[in-house]
Protein backbone atom coordinates (compact mmCIF):
# COMPACT_ATOMS: atom_id res chain seq x y z
CA UNK A 1 0.00 0.00 0.00
CA UNK A 2 1.27 3.46 -0.92
CA UNK A 3 0.45 6.99 0.21
CA UNK A 4 -0.46 9.68 -2.30
CA UNK A 5 -1.37 13.36 -2.18
CA UNK A 6 -4.31 14.03 -4.47
CA UNK A 7 -5.33 17.59 -5.35
CA UNK A 8 -7.53 19.56 -7.71
CA UNK A 9 -7.88 23.20 -8.72
CA UNK A 10 -11.14 23.04 -10.70
CA UNK A 11 -13.60 23.79 -7.89
CA UNK A 12 -11.86 26.30 -5.62
CA UNK A 13 -14.66 28.07 -3.80
CA UNK A 14 -15.91 27.57 -0.28
CA UNK A 15 -17.17 24.14 0.77
CA UNK A 16 -14.67 22.40 -1.50
CA UNK A 17 -11.84 19.93 -1.04
CA UNK A 18 -8.50 21.08 -2.41
CA UNK A 19 -6.49 17.98 -1.51
CA UNK A 20 -6.28 14.77 0.46
CA UNK A 21 -3.76 12.15 1.51
CA UNK A 22 -4.97 8.72 0.46
CA UNK A 23 -3.74 5.15 0.76
CA UNK A 24 -3.98 3.23 -2.50
CA UNK A 25 -2.32 0.38 -4.38
CA UNK A 26 -1.67 2.53 -7.46
CA UNK A 27 -1.61 6.09 -8.78
CA UNK A 28 -4.81 5.38 -10.72
CA UNK A 29 -6.59 4.08 -7.62
CA UNK A 30 -5.50 7.24 -5.77
CA UNK A 31 -6.78 9.45 -8.63
CA UNK A 32 -10.14 7.68 -8.43
CA UNK A 33 -10.54 8.19 -4.67
CA UNK A 34 -13.15 10.80 -3.72
CA UNK A 35 -12.02 12.81 -0.65
CA UNK A 36 -15.32 12.41 1.23
CA UNK A 37 -16.80 9.06 0.33
CA UNK A 38 -17.54 8.32 3.96
CA UNK A 39 -20.33 10.89 4.07
CA UNK A 40 -23.66 9.65 5.37
CA UNK A 41 -25.44 12.16 3.11
CA UNK A 42 -23.91 11.52 -0.29
CA UNK A 43 -21.56 9.08 -1.96
CA UNK A 44 -19.94 9.53 -5.36
CA UNK A 45 -18.88 6.85 -7.82
CA UNK A 46 -17.10 7.15 -11.15
CA UNK A 47 -19.24 6.62 -14.22
CA UNK A 48 -17.98 4.96 -17.41
CA UNK A 49 -16.56 8.29 -18.66
CA UNK A 50 -14.54 9.00 -15.50
CA UNK A 51 -16.98 11.55 -14.02
CA UNK A 52 -18.03 11.41 -10.39
CA UNK A 53 -21.79 11.18 -9.95
CA UNK A 54 -23.99 10.76 -6.89
CA UNK A 55 -27.05 8.55 -6.61
CA UNK A 56 -29.07 11.23 -8.45
CA UNK A 57 -26.57 11.46 -11.32
CA UNK A 58 -25.29 14.86 -10.15
CA UNK A 59 -21.63 15.91 -10.37
CA UNK A 60 -19.86 17.10 -7.21
CA UNK A 61 -19.48 20.79 -6.48
CA UNK A 62 -16.86 20.15 -3.79
CA UNK A 63 -14.24 18.31 -5.88
CA UNK A 64 -13.12 17.92 -9.48
CA UNK A 65 -15.86 16.62 -11.77
CA UNK A 66 -13.61 14.13 -13.55
CA UNK A 67 -10.79 11.90 -12.31
CA UNK A 68 -8.55 13.25 -15.10
CA UNK A 69 -8.65 16.66 -13.35
CA UNK A 70 -6.99 15.24 -10.21
CA UNK A 71 -3.23 15.61 -9.68
CA UNK A 72 -1.45 12.78 -7.88
CA UNK A 73 1.90 12.87 -6.06
CA UNK A 74 3.50 9.76 -4.57
CA UNK A 75 4.46 10.33 -0.91
CA UNK A 76 5.83 6.96 0.19
CA UNK A 77 4.94 3.54 1.51
CA UNK A 78 2.10 3.16 4.00
CA UNK A 79 2.53 1.32 7.29
CA UNK A 80 1.77 -2.38 7.15
CA UNK A 81 -1.93 -3.02 7.64
CA UNK A 82 -3.06 0.35 6.27
CA UNK A 83 -6.32 0.00 4.36
CA UNK A 84 -7.06 1.89 1.16
CA UNK A 85 -8.98 5.14 1.40
CA UNK A 86 -8.74 8.70 2.65
CA UNK A 87 -6.26 9.31 5.49
CA UNK A 88 -6.76 13.09 5.75
CA UNK A 89 -8.61 15.62 3.58
CA UNK A 90 -8.36 19.41 3.30
CA UNK A 91 -11.84 20.98 3.17
CA UNK A 92 -12.37 24.71 2.74
CA UNK A 93 -15.56 25.39 4.69
CA UNK A 94 -17.53 28.52 3.87
Where are these regions (language model features)?
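Short, mixed-charge low-complexity intrinsically disordered segments
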Residues: 36-94
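Short beta-strand element of the conserved SAM-dependent methyltransferase core
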Residues: 4-6, 21-22, 43, 72
